[in-house]
């Protein structure tokens, strides 16, 4: 009898562990948030999500897909959550729920052009063609600037066209623009658009309120931790001092 009980407890324990798997969608083309390095997904979002999952007792199963396919995949229950440097905009909140923001510093969006161009500010790009990634908030910024957005599956594709002068500019989050400016020739930054949109958060299905709260509580606990500070310093060194100063004020 004791052996039977022990076996049942082992089975229940195994099932419980399996139930703690969390399928998380991302788009590994958005350095330094998430990107591929030696065929392995790395980045701030990847490490931070693993940190949250460990704290809450989940095993993350990563699913890499196109940015515009993330929320549909979440709604169709192909994944349980999305972390991809995604802003919790009012439009997106109509379809899904979000955690509290997990990025706690101010950012913006850089306007990048070909180095040979004579454009000086974002205003010079009114009526011009601006490359943005499909499904991102940069499309709205381009429209608000009076530019014509051209949609790409990735920002890398947009920058390749910019290098070849097939488009007039690219609008991208400043934190990611830094990486492209370091590694790609023939492009330059001319302006920055102040970001008034909500900061990056983790997306969940509307029905998963308990899961969203669980992660929100963990985010708020971790934001003052040494682990979080180390991740900021590693992936966003230009924001580290401002981040530390903001924490000390609280």
Feature locations, PLM:
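Extracytoplasmic small-molecule ligand-binding "clamshell" domains
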Residues: 19-86
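Periplasmic-binding protein-like
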Residues: 28, 105-113, 178-220, 238-250
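Short helix-initiation/N-cap motifs at beta->coil->alpha
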Residues: 61-74, 134-135, 150-164, 196
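Alpha-to-beta junction loops
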Residues: 58-59, 76-84, 128, 163-176, ...
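Ligand-binding clefts/hinges and TM-proximal coupling segments of bilobed small-molecule sensing domains
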Residues: 137-150, 189-191, 219-250
